[in-house]
Design a protein with these regions (language model features):
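Cleft-lining beta-strand/loop regions that shape enzyme active-site pockets
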Residues: 1-152
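C-terminal regions of proteins
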Residues: 148, 158-160
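Short, small/polar residue-rich loop motifs at catalytic or cofactor-binding pockets
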Residues: 155
């Protein structure tokens, strides 16, 4: 790992600590730097320890995209519909790991591609508020199959994106 990755990790970690301290442990924080298959591990690592808090911040600022927006949205859409209360211990509920609190998503001008799709899906599905600045604006599927003679790559829009209204 290079120094830039380590600085980014520190930035992410300090955001998590700040949220935890400012909310006295009542709000969880999950940052996803991208939406690739490898980022599923980050989701598991960061979401499950905070799934039972009163609030959740999902930070997709600087998100480079990928293709797991639907997978994460599915996890956030889960709803508990009944509960178990043991004589001793904590209440549990069906739809294990269903988040039951308030949620927001943070975006910025560096939120790109599938990070934008995630934020738009979050908003359209009524999961919570999207907060931040206008995103990158490239919520399109790109292809990198256009390899040049010098082995460089030209990315070009391959699929446009639109909502149910057209």
């Amino acid at each position: 790992r290079d120094a830039a990755d380590l600085r980014y990790d520190e930035w992410e970690y300090t955001r998590r600590l700040e949220v935890d301290e400012a909310s006295q442990g009542q709000i969880g924080y999950v940052h996803l730097r991208a939406m690739g298959g490898g980022n599923v591990t980050e989701w598991y690592r960061d979401f499950y320890p905070v799934f039972n808090r009163q609030g959740l911040i999902v930070d997709v600022r600087h998100n480079r995209g990928g293709n797991i927006d639907s997978w994460i949205l599915e996890k956030l859409m889960r709803r508990a519909w009944f509960y178990w209360q043991p004589r001793v211990g904590r209440t549990t509920w069906n739809m294990q790991w269903a988040f039951r609190g308030h949620m927001v998503v943070l975006v910025d001008e560096w939120t790109a591609s599938d990070g934008e799709a995630f934020a738009e899906g979050f908003r359209r599905l009524g999961l919570g508020q999207v907060i931040g600045t206008r995103t990158w604006g490239g919520e399109i599927w790109l292809t990198s199959s256009n390899v040049l003679v010098d082995r460089g790559i030209v990315t070009a829009a391959e699929f446009g994106v639109f909502g149910p209204e057209g």
